[in-house]
UniProtKB/Swiss-Prot annotation:
Pathway: Secondary metabolite metabolism; methylglyoxal degradation; (R)-lactate from methylglyoxal: step 2/2
Entry function: Thiolesterase that catalyzes the hydrolysis of S-D-lactoyl-glutathione to form glutathione and D-lactic acid.
Organism: Brucella anthropi (strain ATCC 49188 / DSM 6882 / CCUG 24695 / JCM 21032 / LMG 3331 / NBRC 15819 / NCTC 12168 / Alc 37)
GO biological process, one term: methylglyoxal catabolic process to D-lactate via S-lactoyl-glutathione
Top-level enzyme category: hydrolase
GO molecular function: hydroxyacylglutathione hydrolase activity; metal ion binding
Cofactor: record remark: Binds 2 Zn(2+) ions per subunit.
EC number: 3.1.2.6
Pfam family, one: HAGH_C
Protein name (record): Hydroxyacylglutathione hydrolase
Subunit (UniProt): Monomer.
Keywords: Hydrolase, Metal-binding, Zinc
Length: 260
């Protein structure tokens, strides 16, 4: 007897100025979750557009532009808010805490929690292996990574190592539409990368048409994102770090991005 893999429906939209709102929906159980809650009104509009109701919020980290809609959405829909244990006191309305290695179910889908600190001390990513998708908050961006507000370069490097270990065909959904500016920086670090140059041109076309640049994929990020290319000989040579540890190469790239 053949089994049919479950299908996850994903509704992605830009809200606030550059935040991504992301709703995930399991049609068989009719459950819907919001990845973070940047803007309650925008999320409500997306739910109405799709004819869904909201059951969960999966919080990646405590920053206001990711949790500001929590209380309004909880009041309207009675949602259960899940978020990182390490940031429990900073997440409005939180009902359930999770930590690295935890696993829970969302309808027919397994959700694996990956601790990805660096941007904040307790940030987590949510990986749905059956849907081949990972939701990385402000840890991994398209062609970038999050600023280190509460972590060190080594902390973020170790978090990114966890994400690049996922299958290459895993779709990547992140918290912000920063891709065009990230591409400009990436080209200063890896100017000979033909895949990056092609991607940067495509990103420019998409943004000129006011279209979204996500989702990406783990494979695409590994091929073009300088923050994941600490091993590349050309990048190392350009930075003067030919023999440096991988984490030192990453730290130098992050330092340069902070000054870009």
């Amino acid at each position: 007897m053949n089994s049919i893999a479950p299908r996850l429906e994903i509704e992605q939209f830009i809200c606030r100025s550059d935040n991504y709102g992301v709703l995930i929906h399991d049609p068989q159980s009719a459950l819907t979750a919001s990845i973070d809650a940047p803007d309650a009104a925008a999320i409500e509009a997306a739910l109405k557009r799709r004819g869904w109701t909201l059951d969960f919020i999966f919080t990646t980290h405590h920053h206001l532009d990711h949790v500001e809609g929590n209380e309004a959405l909880k009041a309207k829909y009675g949602v259960s808010i899940i978020g990182p244990k390490a940031e429990e006191t900073k997440i409005p309305g939180i009902d359930r805490t999770v930590k690295d290695g935890d696993e829970f179910t969302f309808g027919l889908f397994r959700v694996k929690v990956i601790a990805t600190p660096g941007h904040t001390a307790g940030e987590v990513s949510y990986y749905l292996p059956d849907a081949k998708a990972v939701f990385t908050g402000d840890t991994l961006f398209a062609l970038g990574c999050g600023r280190l507000f509460e972590g060190t370069p080594l902390t973020m490097f170790q978090s990114l190592q966890k994400l690049v270990a996922l299958p290459g065909d895993t779709a990547v959904y992140c918290g912000h539409e920063y891709t065009e500016s990230n591409a400009r920086f990436a080209l200063t670090i890896d100017p000979a990368n033909s895949a990056l140059k092609e991607r940067a041109a495509e990103i420019a076309r998409l943004r000129a048409a006011d279209r979204m640049t996500l989702p990406s994929s783990i494979a695409l990020e590994m091929a073009t994102n300088p923050f994941l290319r600490w091993h590349d000989a050309g990048i190392r040579s350009r930075l003067g770090l030919q023999d440096a540890p991988d984490e030192a190469v990453f730290a130098e790239i992050r330092k340069r991005k902070d000054m870009f």
